[in-house]
Amino acid sequence: MKKYSLLFILMILILDISAQEKPSDFNWVQLFNGKDLNDWKVKIAGYPLGENYGNTFRVEDGKMKVSYAEYDSFGVKYGHIFYKEKYAWYIIAAEYRFTGEQAKGGQGWATRNSGIMIHGQDPVTMTKDQDFPISIEVQLLGGLGSGLRPTANLCTPGTNVVLNGKLLTAHCINSSSKTYNGDNWVRVEVMVFGDSLIRHIVNGDTVLEYTKPQIGGGNVLNADPAIKIDGNLLSEG
């Protein structure tokens, strides 16, 4: 019996809108080189920065893979992988799919559940036992075979946003995407305009947008209070 794994292909378009004048000036930059994770930092809750417990993040067949095959039990070992550079105005595109079955000991809500953390906290400032980075999460979900389960939703670990002119303090809000069952690849793009507009796009369709990402609220454990200063706008990560 396999455990769920997540396959990722990542690339990023550096918009730098303040400096560029024409869309034709934009060029895709491939973040993941298809060979190794030398440009990335791993942070797993309960472990020091850089310790890739259980070889969670790995490269197989030219793809970035998140696997729990070496876990006896998942527990609360929430893991994140951070690129070496920060960006402020950009489009990030990812193609993902889920394969296998849920890791033993994993929470029910975490089944076929991953995400892209936008404007994420510098992992150097995360505590050893912090579960999630302070960030804006573009939640990536896979269907469960029945019922609705959209993807590219918004979740807010230690953050809030403004939606339809009002401060949103709920932890997660669904996008308008359809449900993607099975193990087919899904393409997600996120347009990020500094601390103003963020837009979620799935297979070419805009499914959610909001403004003014900022630190606030809960839904993140063991964060350093010197870092989690509520009300501060998030402009890069």
Regions found by a protein language model. Name each.
Residues Q20-G237:
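Carbohydrate-interacting regions of secretory-pathway proteins
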Residues M1-P23:
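Bacterial Sec-dependent N-terminal signal peptides
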